[in-house]
């Protein structure tokens, strides 16, 4: 059958009800269709990209309509064979009922084409709507033939095809131009379903996020300013992208240029000045370690402190003391003219060896401890300054730095012995029996024969009652 051309300005856009009530119903019942615009093609023996060439109605709307005979998967079964040579059609969602004038006339099924074989197929943008006629719409002569044909609408959505798992995944980002045209890497348009207007292809690509890192030296602020305030984003909006593809894209790290860090101009002299200013207020009650910016890459000026056992001494030189500005501060004042003032120290500038026991002291800082430390510490002369020609006055400020070392105590675990319970049995001992017998024997001689017989009878009855009571008590305890 030759292709049919419509006059200019006409488009073939039938509704679901029109496709079923007119075209599909007339095809199954054997009635004549006025204009043959839908061809009969076995869709499950053709690939979807070959279907546009088999359509009788060429159109720029990228939608094609076909009558497809039903191909059963099994001879005795009702399942349809939807596998092609290069892939398969997979149903998505539930079948929707198509109604007309409050009565059901057919069903609509949505299918998506996958390349390869299940379950490792690759989803594509080819979508098919399969319409089937309800059995109530069949003529008596064509009863039971409602499943003989299906009317199919085939169109293509522009989506991002997922790569197989065994292949290397690389996502190319193509930036949209100002006019809002498509990008050539993914063929991504503003809408998932292609409209009547054709889109131009842009051949400009941006660097790949998956394989190439950004060069922070080559990227300036102007490169990133193009994204601010723009209505076009590097990626489509979330509701236009398939969920599966979006999740797979988020699994890859997108490397952005590092932030530019400006080093603050903080010199050693400023640090030492601030430390000296803080010393007057007694800040050195705790250990303070001075950090300099210039010694990060220069290991020559670093101070190495060897800490051994408690008997070893921690020795530092006066030169390093003045550089780091902690433990001790010495001020040397010189004068060319001799004065009558009595200097505190003459001639030699001394350096003290600080014992590590001073740092591991548990005593509270007070003046008595300072005097005791001054009496016990040894002073060794390591460097000598020539004092000929001027007098040297050294003001020495001492600080007692202490460290509190505490130990934690382990918890005690107490084990309790479990002893099984014991059963306690109680037996009632009738004490009144012996008392009454003794009373009876004492008064035997004083009473007559009748009285004695009466007393014996009462005694027997009393004994019998006591025995009965004891018997019932034992039964009660036993049960």
From Swiss-Prot:
- Residues crossing the lipid bilayer are none
Supply the alphabetized keyword list.
DNA-binding, Nucleus, Transcription, Transcription regulation
| Molecular function per GO | DNA-binding transcription factor activity; transcription cis-regulatory region binding
Name the GO terms of the biological process aspect.
sieve element differentiation; sieve element enucleation
Domain NAC: residue ranges: 6-157
GO annotation, cellular component aspect:
nucleus
Q: Which InterPro entries match?
A: NAC-dom, NAC_dom_sf
Q: Which domain of life is it from?
A: Eukaryota
Pfam families from the entry? Answer: NAM
Q: Which residues bind DNA?
A: 105-163
Q: In which tissues is it expressed?
A: Expressed in a few sieve element cells before enucleation and in phloem-pole pericycle cells.
| Protein name (database record) | NAC domain-containing protein 45
Name its species: Arabidopsis thaliana (Mouse-ear cress)
């Amino acid at each position: 059958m030759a292709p049919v051309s419509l006059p200019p300005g006409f488009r073939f856009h039938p509704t679901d009800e029109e496709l079923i009530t007119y075209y599909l119903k007339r095809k199954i019942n054997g009635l004549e269709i006025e204009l043959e615009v839908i061809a009969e093609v076995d869709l499950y023996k053709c690939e979807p990209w070959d279907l546009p060439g088999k359509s009788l109605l060429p159109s720029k709307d990228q939608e094609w309509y076909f009558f497809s005979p039903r191909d059963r998967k099994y001879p005795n079964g009702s399942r349809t064979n939807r596998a092609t040579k290069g892939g398969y059609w997979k149903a998505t969602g539930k079948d929707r009922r198509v109604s007309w004038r409050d009565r059901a006339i057919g069903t609509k099924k949505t299918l998506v084409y996958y390349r390869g074989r299940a379950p490792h197929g690759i989803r594509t943008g080819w979508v098919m709507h399969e319409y089937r006629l309800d059995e109530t719409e069949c003529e008596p002569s064509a009863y039971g033939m409602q499943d003989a044909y299906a009317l199919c609408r085939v169109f293509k959505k522009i989506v991002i095809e997922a790569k197989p798992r065994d292949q290397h995944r690389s996502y190319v980002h193509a930036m949209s131009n100002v006019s809002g045209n498509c990008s050539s890497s993914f063929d991504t348009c503003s809408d998932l379903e292609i409209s009547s207007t054709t889109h131009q292809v842009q051949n400009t690509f941006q660097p790949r996020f998956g394989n190439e890192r950004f060069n922070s030296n080559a990227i300036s602020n102007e490169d990133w300013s193009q994204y601010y305030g723009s209505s076009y984003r590097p990626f489509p909006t979330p509701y236009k992208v398939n969920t599966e593809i979006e999740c797979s894209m988020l699994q890859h790290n997108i490397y952005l240029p590092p932030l530019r860090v400006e080093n603050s101009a903080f010199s050693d002299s400023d640090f030492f000045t601030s430390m000296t200013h803080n010393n007057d207020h007694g800040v050195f009650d705790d250990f303070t370690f001075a950090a300099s910016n210039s010694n990060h890459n220069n290991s020559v000026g670093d101070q190495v402190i060897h800490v051994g056992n408690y008997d070893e001494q921690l020795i530092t030189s006066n030169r390093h003391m003045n550089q780091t500005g902690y433990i001790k501060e010495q001020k040397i004042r010189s004068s060319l003219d001799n004065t009558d003032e009595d200097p505190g120290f003459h001639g030699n500038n001394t350096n003290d060896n600080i014992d590590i026991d001073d740092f591991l002291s548990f005593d509270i800082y007070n003046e008595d401890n300072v005097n005791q430390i001054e009496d016990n510490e040894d002073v060794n002369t390591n460097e000598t300054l020539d004092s000929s020609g001027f007098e040297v006055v050294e003001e020495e400020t001492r600080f007692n730095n202490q460290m509190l070392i505490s130990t934690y105590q382990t918890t005690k675990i107490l084990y309790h012995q479990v002893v099984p319970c014991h059963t306690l049995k109680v037996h009632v001992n009738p004490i009144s029996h012996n008392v009454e017998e003794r009373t009876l024997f004492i008064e035997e001689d004083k009473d007559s024969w009748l009285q004695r017989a009466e007393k014996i009878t009462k005694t027997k009855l009393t004994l019998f009652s006591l025995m009965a009571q004891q018997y019932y008590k034992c039964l009660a305890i036993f049960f």
